[in-house]
């Protein structure tokens, strides 16, 4: 089956950088150098990394939203990872930094989004970069400008871990910018989204064990199909009706999301175990 590419994209997956103060301070230093040198360019006011281009419609937003959450849930953090920015240079009409350390994240996002039936990534090879400014045609033709840009130095690293302010967002091309950020359709913190405190006691067993039999006991008779696979499918996509399952359980329980994703129970029968008295 042929792969569909977002060669005429209308959205992208955004990794905003404005919240990383140390990076932004150095980033703006580069922009100041350009302006001080008199290079005619339009400064980027919302520093970011475009992790994947998308060709999607509003009805696809929910699928891409869920794919982003699944990528975050499946991340193996360890001690975290580093994003490295260096080598200011001209790419097309833009002055950009090379970005290294997010290649695996790019691949995961593309694969998970495609698994949802949505179009992601372009036919040309993805190159991680961060735009500093866009040159005018006149500025691009001036050799002194090109030589100055090629002589610029930059080297900065950001460490991303579960406590970092890192986010993944769906942004429409041409979206407005405010205070260093794009207007977003969806924005998710990349930290580990474990939450063990259920909103009510009634949901505690469902969120803690993700056992289909427990779920059936908590729901009204006939709410779930008798076939287990059909039941998991209904739970996974129950948010279509904006039910309390999605609002209070699916969004809050890592285990429940993974159980729904795998169509399998995580409880191993422990919910029925009893404590023996001495």
Swiss-Prot record:
This is Non-structural protein 2a. Transmembrane segments: none annotated. It holds the Pfam family Corona_NS2A. Belongs to the coronaviruses ns2a protein family. It comes from the Viruses. It comes from Bovine coronavirus (strain LY-138). Signal peptide: none annotated.
